[in-house]
C-alpha cells in the first residue's frame, strides 16, 4: 500500500516548517539515516522522532480548537 502526502499542505501548516529544505526539525541526522537493529527489530529513529513532532503539533492544534 502506498500513501502520498502533499508536503506543502501537511508540513506547511507548522510554523517551524521551512518548506522541506532540510533546515527544519524534520532534518535527518547522520545517526538516523538508516534503520538500526534494537532487540531483534529494525527501528527507524527518524520516523519515530518526526512522528512525535507531528503528534505534538497536532496536540497543540487540538488544544487551540478546544
Curated annotation (Swiss-Prot):
So what family is this one in?
A: Belongs to the lambda phage ral family.
What is the protein name stated in its UniProt record?
A: Restriction inhibitor protein ral
A Pfam family: Ral
What is the recorded function of this protein according to its Swiss-Prot or TrEMBL entry? Ral interferes with the cleavage of DNA by E.coli EcoK restriction-modification system, by modifying the activity of the host methylase. This modulation allows incoming, unmodified phages to escape the host's restriction system.
In the UniProt record, does the keyword Nucleotide-binding occur? no
- GO BP field: symbiont-mediated evasion of host restriction-modification system; symbiont-mediated suppression of host innate immune response
Organism expressing this protein natively: Escherichia phage lambda
**Per its UniProt record, what InterPro entries does this chain match?**
Antirestriction_protein_Ral
What keywords appear on the UniProt entry? Host-virus interaction, Inhibition of host innate immune response by virus, Restriction-modification system evasion by virus, Viral immunoevasion
Report which superkingdom the organism of origin falls in: Viruses
